[in-house]
Amino acid sequence: MDFRNAKELLKVCQEQGLSISALMLQRELTEGEQDPEETDRKMDRVLEIMKSAASTPIHTPVKSMGGLIGGEAKKISDHKDTGKGLCGDLLERAVIYAMATLETNASMGVIVASPTAGSAGIVPGLLLALQETYDLSDEQIKQGLYNASAIGYLAMRNATVAGAVGGCQAEVGIASAMAASATVELMGGSPEQSLAAASTVLMNMLGLVCDPVGGLVEYPCQNRNAAGVANATIAAEIALSGVRQLIPFDEMLEAVYTVGKRLPAELRETALGGCATTPSACAACHMCD
């Protein structure tokens, strides 16, 4: 059982009364030719790695290989503990976990590319925060991961998730869309609302360039993962409220791909423009003339 785009995905969900996560699981079992127990074990492992990557730096901060980040998640966690946080419990937790995951990645730790290493904090950041805030089970979070993977699959099939091809809008943008869609389903929303949230996310991040300082997946990547969970939360809230999304996900994904291909090479992961070529960034990485 396969689907080529969101329109087909939605049609199958409606005809068979399936959630996006249930349909994606069926696809995994048929197209991937894996037995249910093996598939479940693999998803258990994915969730285990996500939890470790999102929590370890909070308790044991480690400097990144490039030296540009390290300890940020703990600082935000400590600030949250003072009761002076601005974002509310859910978003504060999501930001902490997202930034911690990027610290794990940048210090050669094990992460789950979701869909890429540079955007690996967004999906686990928001889903783990939801789990703690709403007392969700691991099985429910795995359901969210199947939903998120459906959005990622469509993006990889019909566009790109690579910053080198489509800019940060394709990398952090798609990860944020995955998280938003999963959040909507976990909060009781429909497949239509999940896709609306994913479309809203991409609209909000359209045109974002990929400009890693020193060519490293550290800065501004970590901060953009934090922005990604905020974007996903906002988009999910909008969709769950019943606000209409004018542009379908398939069309929004095509727009992301078109804009990405029009970005100059300097703004697609080459570190030759944007944040990467500011004087302070050059001084920090000791790489620019």
Residue ranges of model-derived segments:
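Generic N-terminal targeting/processing segments that precede catalytic cores or assembly contacts
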Residues: 1-109, 133, 242, 249-289
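Active-site-adjacent structural elements in folded domains
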Residues: 108-111, 161-167, 219
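Acidic-glycine-rich active-site phosphate/pyrophosphate-binding loop
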Residues: 88-105, 140-159, 203-212
